[in-house]
Design a protein with these regions (language model features):
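Amphipathic alpha-helical dimerization/coiled-coil segments
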Residues: 81-123
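A short acidic, leucine-rich amphipathic alpha-helix
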Residues: 22, 35-41, 54
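Short coil turns linking two alpha-helices in DNA-binding domains
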Residues: 29, 43-45
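Short helix-to-turn junction characteristic of helix-turn-helix DNA-binding domains
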Residues: 14, 23-30
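Short, cationic-aromatic polyanion-contact patches
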Residues: 4-18, 32, 65-87
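Glycine-centered, phosphate/nucleic-acid-interacting loop/turn motifs that mediate DNA/RNA or nucleotide
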Residues: 58, 64
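Residues within the DNA-recognition helix of helix-turn-helix
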Residues: 50
Length: 123
């Protein structure tokens, strides 16, 4: 979404304890659906439903992690950094601050410039 969602929509998503647990876990490190199910003690279908809802509001990001053997899977990281609510002259305004998750484990840079920059940093 390019615009911040309505306050009620964001609060509705955040009122769900499973969604909050997923955000909390993925704010520490990117996690797969199975890792989230184990960490947050919920079923994988519950994880997928909540992740989809969080993605609808750009509160979590999905990327593909690639293992050394070529297998790949989705990992999720919270993009929500801060939510502030302001009451001014009879109306509420919400401001959602997002962060760019760091590179996910197993993620390979696909852009040549990214690969070169990474190589240069490691010299």
């Amino acid at each position: 979404m390019s615009e911040d969602p309505a306050l009620g929509d964001v609060l509705d998503v955040l009122s769900d304890e499973y969604a909050r647990a997923i955000l909390a876990a993925t704010s520490v490190k990117p996690m797969s659906a199975q890792q989230l199910a184990d960490e947050c003690e919920m079923s994988k279908p519950t994880v997928y439903r909540r992740v989809e809802r969080l993605r609808d509001y750009d509160l979590i990001e999905e990327r593909t992690a690639i293992q050394d053997d070529g297998n790949h899977y989705s990992v999720y990281a919270a993009t929500l950094s801060e939510l502030s609510v302001e009451l001014d002259e009879g109306s509420f305004e919400a401001d959602v601050t997002r962060r760019e998750p760091e590179a996910f484990p197993g993620q390979r840079e696909t852009d040549t410039a990214d690969r070169f920059a990474k190589m240069w940093e490691n010299l």
